[in-house]
């Protein structure tokens, strides 16, 4: 009979009987292709779930409300995603040595993730973005050197010009990057010193999606000054606040995200002040 009949979605069974499923799983991973090219995954929530997640098997608590959002970001932007992650629940399930739930697609592309402290995670992410900007500025200067010279073929110049005009368009830069890499290889073969330098900058051709992720402890309390500074900078970064309304990772203590009247550790008689309106504060910029 079916051992799952009448049970809930997850049922505990002896491991020995499940080992045969490993072969089935490996077959599916190796042979079943992604279907995300059949729909526009960014048009609505339903379509987004056809995109392959690049965040899997995190080991977070069952029923965790944070991981679906982290997974969704990887489905939409994972192949070009950079993550600056505050310490907290999200740093535990995202980077517990020796494994990580972040993975790569069939082209070897996936999120680049790093963990920082509670108090500087936003500045850390802003630093990533500023470094990325500087490297891309260098690419523009080198491309302009090639465009001003007489050695490159006209078709190659058109591709470089198209990149400069569309360098902030993710889809366009994805399309142009392989063509530019081929042009750089041709330049190296022809002894072009500019092409040699560009070879080390090819990872910056595709527009990156910079994410800053932290919980309410980091975002509302300990790292709020940095969060405010980064929002005020106007830089092209995305901030995900995993607001559980308590300090989840340390056991449920009250934070400035905890609503008025709520009972939590350090607020046993009910929180005395209202929840800090972080969204409203962000709109002041």
Positions of PLM-derived features:
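Non-heme iron-sulfur electron-transfer modules
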Residues: 2-47, 109, 155
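Thiamine diphosphate
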Residues: 32-33, 93-94, 103, 190-192, ...
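Mobile "lid/hinge" segments at catalytic clefts and subdomain interfaces of large enzymes
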Residues: 95-133, 241-246, 253-254
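Conserved thiamine diphosphate
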Residues: 47-60, 115-130, 134-149, 206, ...
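Extended, highly charged accessory segments
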Residues: 70-71, 76-87, 95-100
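Cysteine-centered iron-sulfur cluster-binding motifs in ferredoxin-type domains/subunits
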Residues: 1-7, 61-67
